[in-house]
Structures are given as C-alpha cells and as structure tokens.
C-alpha cells in the first residue's frame, strides 16, 4: 500500500494562529482513512532549511511515497492548490526564528521553476465537491511555502501543496480540515 505524508506548517510572524498545523493534527486525531494509502502526519517548523529537512526526515521515517504540504496564505480568501514552485525567496520576510534567507534564490544552481505532477486538478475538484471554494494556483508565493515546495519537488516528485485561508467567520477550522481531507483523498486515489 502507498504511504502519504501530510505536513502542516506551524506559526510564523504574520500568522501566529496558522491553522495549517491544527488542521493536520485534527486529521490525525480523527483516525480517518483514505483508500489507496496509509497516512502519516507531521508539523513543520516555519524556519528556513528546517521545514524541508523535517519533511524529508518524516518521509524517510515513514517510507512515504508522496507528501501533501499544507500552509496558510494570509492573502487568500479561498483554498489554492499549487501547481508550481519558483526559485525565488523574499528578502523582507523573516522565518519563525527571525532569520532571513540570505539570497533571492532558493538554489543558485536550480531551475527557475519546478512543477507539481500530483493531481492538482482532482484535488481542487474534491475540495469544491465539499462545497468549499478552491482554485488552481501557479504562484506559491515567495516565503516558506514556496521554499519548501521547491526543495521537496527536487527530492520527492509526488509532492503537492494546499494553501488554506486564515481563520475567519466564513472559514473555520472544520472547513480547513474538510478541505485538507478532500485534497488528501484525491491525492491518495491517484497513487493507486
């Protein structure tokens, strides 16, 4: 059976109440199942180098075939399934430890973009089928979400990323858990 790792990012300066990690932790407690894959979970520190390192260590420990990254976009009003990562990083946003990435590039020798081959369209449709607003996105930003997606795509081709909105009267934690579960189920179905 295939193994899917779901990783949620922890808090960072612009999102001290980042709902990504709590949503992933809730899924773990729910003991839900998906056909086609065994699921494991991890919380990633929102720290340069540590986020991809933690994800890769969890992938290895679990012998996972694929990973679904979940992060918050403080600017998003809907769920966004990312389709690519760019070799760029913000020079004005510090990580959770107050550090800045030392270069405008993630990898000085890497390609300008890395594309997601995971079933982004099916994941988007699955979220929409649950009555939530979701779209495909070709811009994962220039912070740790994009950074980690770019790094992981180099090591684990079956990496997907779901950006979730911040908590609001319109989007509560239950909605975010529903979206992550739907995306994970669609992703796992593609692994069969």
Regions found by a protein language model. Give the residues of each.
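Hydrophobic, aromatic-enriched interface-forming segments
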Residues: 144-151
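Short active-site-adjacent structural elements
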Residues: 14, 145, 168-172
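An accessory alpha-helical subdomain
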Residues: 159, 163-168
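N-terminal catalytic or cofactor-binding beta/alpha core of small enzyme domains
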Residues: 1-140, 153-157, 174-192
């Amino acid at each position: 059976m295939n193994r899917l790792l779901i990783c949620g990012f922890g808090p960072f300066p612009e999102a001290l109440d980042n709902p990504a990690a709590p949503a992933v932790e809730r899924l773990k407690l729910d003991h839900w199942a998906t056909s086609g894959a065994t699921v494991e979970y991890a919380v990633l520190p929102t720290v340069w180098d540590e986020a991809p390192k933690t994800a890769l260590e969890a992938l290895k420990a679990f012998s996972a075939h694929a990973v679904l990254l979940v992060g918050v976009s403080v600017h998003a009003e809907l769920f966004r399934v990312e389709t690519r990562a760019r070799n760029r990083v913000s020079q004005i946003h510090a990580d959770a430890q107050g550090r800045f990435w030392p270069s405008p590039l993630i990898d000085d020798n890497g390609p300008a973009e890395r594309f997601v081959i995971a079933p982004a369209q099916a994941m988007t449709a699955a979220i929409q089928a649950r009555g939530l607003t979701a779209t495909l996105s070709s811009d994962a930003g220039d912070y740790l979400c994009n950074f980690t997606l770019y790094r992981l795509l180099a090591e684990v081709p079956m990496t997907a990323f779901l950006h979730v909105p911040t908590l609001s009267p319109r989007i509560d934690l239950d909605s975010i858990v529903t979206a992550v579960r739907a995306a994970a189920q669609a992703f796992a179905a593609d692994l069969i």
